[in-house]
Amino acid sequence: MDSDNDVTLSQTKTAGSSGTEVYKQNGHVRAEEFEESLAKRIKLDGQPVSGLQTAANGGVGRRKGVAPVKKEYLIEVSQSTGQASPRAIADDDAAEAAKHHEKDGGGAKQKGRREKKGGQNIKRTFGRSQDEKQLCQTVAYYPEFSPNPCAFGKSCKFEHDIRKYLKNYKRADLDTFGGVCPVWEAKGRCPSGWKCRFVGSHMAERETEDGRKELVLVEDASRMRHPTSTNGIEVDGVVNVVTTEAKLALAKKRYQTPKADSYTTWIDTVSREVERNLHGRNQDEAASVPGNADGQGTSDSKDRKEDNRAQYTEPPFLPSEKRRLYFGPETPVLAPLTTQGNLPFRRLCVDLGAQLTYSEMAMSMSLVQGSKSEWALMKAHESETLPPAVNPKQTIVKDYDNSRDLKFGAQITGNKPWVALRATEAMTALCPQLRVIDMNCGCPIDMVFREGSGSALLDHASKLEKMLRGMNAVSGEIPITAKIRMGTKDSNPTATKLIERLIMGGVESHEIGRGPAGVAAITLHGRSRQQRYSRQADWEYISQCAALVKRLNEQTDIGTDTIKEPDARDQPSAGKVFFLGNGDCYSHEDYFNGIQKSGVDTVMVARGALVKPWIFEEIEKGQYLDKSASERLALVEKFARYGLEAWGSDEYGVGNTRRFLLEYLSFTHRYIPVGILEYLPPSIQDRPPAWKGRNELETLLGSDNYKDWIKISEMFLGPAHKDFKFEPKHKSNSYEIVAEG
């Protein structure tokens, strides 16, 4: 049912219906129509309640956990509406692995007659957006009279008459964006052909030699690119495009990964030898290792270690020399974000100043099996292949070549070394435009954890080290990095031990005479798996780990008991392991505090970028930016444009863009403008009270009712398809109650 909290816009109609001039003029959104400030219209059934104690309304100081909104922007609501309390903090695990969480499908059954509104809608559906009758591919992209016979002939279930399709089976053209197809406008041609929802802007009727009128698609050669299907090379501004043949070879187990296979065999062989030698020594030998009375114990111990190491099989090959990396204060990082971290969103963040980006987390096994959806995660926009901006006056890293660097990296996770190694070798060959390959050891989602991936690797440090060492060996010039959490349990943080192992190498590595695993960077999320997002990130612990990393990097004798100097190819390419902090970064103050006070090289921004993508702009300028409602709406429009370019402007592409735009709005609606806050800095953990904006559009953008998000999407994508569905990720946004009695 409709919520009593729905924002009402005076004389407003959805895009495509009468009265759209309130939103648009000549197809463009007119944010100026929202200059007057109007409150949310809330039905008051009882006496108003105002229980928020902040400095703004007479309270003393800043109330912990509640956003300090100025008194004049607070809304007094009745007890019957149930809105007096601040909104609950949403479970943001989905920002790390939403689609894998949705696959889990678990969840206890709801008891009682009122549905529980907390938690997540695990089994979400989005309906289908498609034409009433689809156009056959043999005519979808060609002039009306093109001689392209259909192999199915009269038995084909799709339409072949273009005029009939346009008149009867395709919805009317959209009049947003001035009625001009954003894809055609950007690229000079539209890959959606006759199925485009803006096809009227790039079609024409011409007269043929025999006097007939023929419909044709129009292209603008001056703006067209020349796409190529060469593996991994740019196609219409997108890189890392994997061919169908390669994915099919993977699916049929015909794709060869010789390096991964031989290295996996070596890992298995050496692991058995190490296990036998480490745990099979007799007690007398073990007792004699520390030393003896004549002081010759150290020499004897080294001789014994040298003899032991001679028993082990040498690795089949050593890692290739890696591309030099740099992480610093001028390179804020956009975290890997499943679902939300899609190509259009990353492209938007790069526009706003993000210097480094990551793909959504991909499952190694799915990559090895040739999954189309998983390999699609490797695609990146051409803007992500540009070098990150660095300070040219500063000596950064020896032999660092900024011109060879790029912004985009990929993140994977896996539960077995052979899977991770095969995925890494395939990615190295098929996706050349990668800055790094990052191993996710922090994903808290139950399904991922139960498979032994994600944060489960934190409790299996030896296996993780083998995986990273092997990935480093097969990844060519692409460096390997790792993202971890404090540990799996609140009471037992293990990150310090794990960091020491990853930088120095574990006991097994020293047993066989090998050095560290060769990771180029480590990112620490300042929470445990058990904690999830329930409390603030522990930057004190991150600071301790940063000091540890600095100390280990400064050690000249890596591995105090090693016999030989470690091979340079086992070492980080930059001569040091970079250390990144992650957690609750929501402003430029948080960012620079992390670098200056906690000692990290740079900060990885996750939810802060989801709520306000211009956080990167704030970091670059070193100040808060009080974005107006019209400026924020312009970012929504830009996301819609980028979405149509990425997913297409046909019915399916518009539906897909709408779905991800609504996911985007499910985070951005949490933003409270800094201009209406009593205190700064804002905290991402603060729950917002009921508030109104400085004008009606600002109020609309802050609505937590998903029906208002759909209204916003219709400003740019027109009315939703009749079969389109959107279920908010968080049940608290759904406003749906099971009727009683």
UniProtKB/Swiss-Prot annotation:
FMN binds at residues 336-338, 411, 483, 525, 582-584, 606-607. Gene3D superfamilies: Aldolase class I (3.20.20.70). It is an enzyme of class 1 (oxidoreductase). It comes from Ajellomyces capsulatus (strain NAm1 / WU24). Its EC number is 1.3.1.89, 1.3.1.-. It catalyses: 5,6-dihydrouridine(47) in tRNA + NAD(+) = uridine(47) in tRNA + NADH + H(+); 5,6-dihydrouridine(47) in tRNA + NADP(+) = uridine(47) in tRNA + NADPH + H(+); a 5,6-dihydrouridine in mRNA + NAD(+) = a uridine in mRNA + NADH + H(+); a 5,6-dihydrouridine in mRNA + NADP(+) = a uridine in mRNA + NADPH + H(+). Belongs to the Dus family. Dus3 subfamily. Residues 96-106, 300-309 have a biased composition (Basic and acidic residues). The active site is at residue 443. This is tRNA-dihydrouridine(47) synthase [NAD(P)(+)]. The keyword Transmembrane helix does not apply. Residues 1-20 have a biased composition (Polar residues).
